[in-house]
């Protein structure tokens, strides 16, 4: 009985033999297959083709990534922003919104300008009101030769402080104060000693509201109701004062605004009324317009009493900033009542100086 001994070829020799046998077939197939894979345009399909040639198992198909669809109008992020935008006052560039702190992010108890804060280094009048001071001359208070200059300085301080407001700032209660002085700084005649000719004091309590109503391009952004006292703080024949309830409405269109006011004088007894006819000259209301152009402001105000035909008009120009917050300021006035002491005196005045702010 023959016994056969098993023969085992070395592994390296076996691998070389198999490669030699397969080489001709691979040389014929590979170039054509590679060309076919390279011709595939889609990235995923082309990679799968090369994987098959290399003997790798096919990878599971991955669905192509799709970008999240944009939310439809009125949904998603856009909808979330809508309530916030609706809560904020319309028109962030609104002159009334800035002046009266209607922006919900504004300080609850803010101090801000009210009227213009100005200094007129020169104010000239075409007709000095000497008549009202005649009792002082008659009493001998002034020496002979004392006069009132037609040129003087003038300044005004005006600010307001918010005492109360709602969370959305649409309602507010303000305390305001304005002081205007006429200073005979250039007068050294007789014993005049450069006096303050007149100073007017005007405290107010003001309720403000933002209606937020729009008609075309016009926006109604301000309504006010104020309790106003104005006096010159003097006594006897030079005393002037009155108390009013004032209602105001402000509308705007871009860089142009209108502010209209009507007032009612609170009656006083004849014994205490220093100026019973002041409404005849000062009027029942006023209308102001302001136009802003290239950081300049042009303003006009008219007021009067239709039944008497008396009143006044004022024009002013506020320049662009000259030095820090200081701006050039020119004011032209004509009519009655530039000051309380002159309420029934008609004159035309012009003043030149600087201001810290517009009235709006």
Regions found by a protein language model. Give the residues of each.
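Outer-membrane pore/translocation modules
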Residues: 131-142, 149-150, 164-291, 302, ...
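N-terminal signal peptide c-region/cleavage motif recognized by signal peptidases
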Residues: 22-26
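Bacterial N-terminal signal peptides
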Residues: 10-21
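Long, repeat-rich segments with strong aromatic
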Residues: 285-339, 358
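Alpha-helical, heptad-rich or low-complexity scaffold/stalk segments
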Residues: 27-63
């Amino acid at each position: 009985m023959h016994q056969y001994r098993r023969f085992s070829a070395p592994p390296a020799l076996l691998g070389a033999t198999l490669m030699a046998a397969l080489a001709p077939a691979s040389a014929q197939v590979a170039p054509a297959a590679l060309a076919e894979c390279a011709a595939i345009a889609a990235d995923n399909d082309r990679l799968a083709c090369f994987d098959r040639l290399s003997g790798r198992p096919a990878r599971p198909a991955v669905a192509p990534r799709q970008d999240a669809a944009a939310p439809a109008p009125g949904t998603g992020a856009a909808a979330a922003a809508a309530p916030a935008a609706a809560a904020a006052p319309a028109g962030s560039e609104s002159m009334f919104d800035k002046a009266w702190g209607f922006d919900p992010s504004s300080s609850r108890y803010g101090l801000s300008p009210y009227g213009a804060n100005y200094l007129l280094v020169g104010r000239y009048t075409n007709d000095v009101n000497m008549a009202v001071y005649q009792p002082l001359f008659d009493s001998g208070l002034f020496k002979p030769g004392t006069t009132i200059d037609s040129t003087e300085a003038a300044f005004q301080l005006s600010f307001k402080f918010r005492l109360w407001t709602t969370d959305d700032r649409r309602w507010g209660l303000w305390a305001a104060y304005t002081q205007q002085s006429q200073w005979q700084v250039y007068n050294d005649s007789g014993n005049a000693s450069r006096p303050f000719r007149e100073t007017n004091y005007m405290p107010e309590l003001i309720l403000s509201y933002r209606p937020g109503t729009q008609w075309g391009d016009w926006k109604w952004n301000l309504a006010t109701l104020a309790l106003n006292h104005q006096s010159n703080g003097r006594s006897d024949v030079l005393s002037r004062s009155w108390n009013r309830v004032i209602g105001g409405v402000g509308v705007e269109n871009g860089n142009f605004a209108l502010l209209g006011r009507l007032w009612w004088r609170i009656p006083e007894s004849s014994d205490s009324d220093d100026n019973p006819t002041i409404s005849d000259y000062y009027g029942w209301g006023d209308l102001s317009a302001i136009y802003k152009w290239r950081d300049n402001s042009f303003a006009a105000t008219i007021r009067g009493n239709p039944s008497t035909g008396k009143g006044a008009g004022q024009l002013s120009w506020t320049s662009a900033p000259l030095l820090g917050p200081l701006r050039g300021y020119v004011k032209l006035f004509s009519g009655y009542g530039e000051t309380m002491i002159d309420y029934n005196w008609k004159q035309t005045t012009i003043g030149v100086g600087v201001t810290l702010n517009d009235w709006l």
